[in-house]
């Protein structure tokens, strides 16, 4: 049975190498997140200060995947 991913909103606070970012969630937790494959394929740029939507797995809440960038 596949576990459901947790979706959360956050703000990019730092850019790390290899399209990895430090994101501060709305509840003030800081997670490390990378870009999803579709965002990478469509060359969507993410800058510091952007509002993003993340997917977190229930197994490791310190890492996530950026699935959407808000305008």
Swiss-Prot record:
Domain S1-like per the UniProt entry, residue ranges = 1-71
Assembly description? Component of the 30S ribosomal translation pre-initiation complex which assembles on the 30S ribosome in the order IF-2 and IF-3, IF-1 and N-formylmethionyl-tRNA(fMet); mRNA recruitment can occur at any time during PIC assembly.
Q: What is this protein called?
A: Translation initiation factor IF-1
Q: Which InterPro entries match?
A: NA-bd_OB-fold (IPR012340), RNA-binding_domain_S1_IF1 (IPR006196), S1_domain (IPR003029), TIF_IF1 (IPR004368)
Family label = Belongs to the IF-1 family.
Physiological role = One of the essential components for the initiation of protein synthesis. Stabilizes the binding of IF-2 and IF-3 on the 30S subunit to which N-formylmethionyl-tRNA(fMet) subsequently binds. Helps modulate mRNA selection, yielding the 30S pre-initiation complex (PIC). Upon addition of the 50S ribosomal subunit IF-1, IF-2 and IF-3 are released leaving the mature 70S translation initiation complex.
**Could you tell me where this protein is found in the cell?**
Cytoplasm
MF terms from GO for this chain are: ribosome binding; rRNA binding; translation initiation factor activity
Q: Which UniProt keywords apply?
A: Cytoplasm, Initiation factor, Protein biosynthesis, RNA-binding, rRNA-binding
Give the organism the record lists. Buchnera aphidicola subsp. Cinara cedri (strain Cc)
Q: PROSITE patterns annotated for this entry?
A: S1_IF1_TYPE (PS50832)
């Amino acid at each position: 049975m596949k576990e459901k991913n947790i979706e959360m909103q956050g703000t990019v606070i730092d850019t790390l190498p290899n399209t990895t970012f430090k994101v501060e969630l709305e509840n003030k937790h800081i997670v490390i997140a990378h870009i999803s494959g579709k965002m990478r394929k469509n060359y969507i740029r993410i800058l510091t200060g952007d509002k993003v939507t993340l997917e977190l797995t229930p197994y490791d809440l310190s890492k996530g995947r950026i699935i959407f960038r808000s305008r």
